[in-house]
């Protein structure tokens, strides 16, 4: 079983989570992480897909400005060895071009700390931005999306990423 979790301020991350679910209907319906009473439910999944916006641009920590920020430490203490985890992030590549989707990296690092097998990396070459903490090598540590300046690209990026995830998370296939 694969769960889709998100946190949102304006509703955009929830909307994108729902749109992603249309491409991977074998996953559970998206769930707001603030509605999760016991994070240990994540330990019972084969795969986890997380959606996170970046609101606190330039911050060293708590970059999302959402419910994710208050549970990062708890995520790091979970036992997620062997679990596949993918992250999508929302940001604004033109207004906040020096902090594009920075919150993805923070969530990524805590899931890694919990022993998760991180998947869903996306090559940075098809994106226009100046800097992002979410770059590892030549790739983003997840799928960056820009609903402010590049919303016309979101559905095709989601569809491509969903296909990629079906190859990386066996229980989605």
What function would you assign to each model-found segment?
Residues 26-39:
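A short beta-strand-loop structural module common to alpha/beta enzyme folds
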Residues 12-15, 23, 27, 44-173:
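FMN-binding flavodoxin-like domain, especially the glycine-rich phosphate-binding loop
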Residues 3, 32, 148:
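Short, flexible active-site loop motifs that bind/organize anionic cofactors or intermediates
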Residues 2, 36-38, 71-74:
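Short acidic/polar alpha-helix capping motifs at helix-coil junctions
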């Amino acid at each position: 079983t694969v769960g889709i979790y998100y946190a949102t301020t304006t509703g955009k991350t929830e909307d994108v989570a729902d749109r992603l679910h249309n491409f991977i209907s074998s996953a559970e319906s998206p769930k707001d992480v603030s509605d999760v009473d016991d994070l240990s439910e994540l330990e019972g999944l084969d795969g986890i897909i997380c959606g996170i916006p970046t609101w606190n641009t330039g911050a060293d920590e708590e970059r999302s400005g959402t419910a994710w920020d208050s549970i990062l430490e708890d995520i790091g203490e979970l036992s997620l060895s062997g679990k596949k985890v993918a992250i999508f992030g929302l940001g604004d590549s033109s207004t906040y071009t020096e902090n594009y989707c920075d919150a993805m990296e923070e969530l990524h690092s805590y899931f890694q700390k919990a022993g998760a097998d991180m998947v869903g990396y996306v090559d940075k070459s098809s994106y226009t931005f100046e800097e992002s903490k979410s770059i590892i090598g030549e790739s983003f540590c997840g799928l960056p999306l820009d609903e402010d300046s590049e919303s016309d690209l979101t559905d095709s990026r989601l569809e491509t990423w969903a296909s990629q995830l079906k190859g990386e998370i066996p229980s989605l296939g």
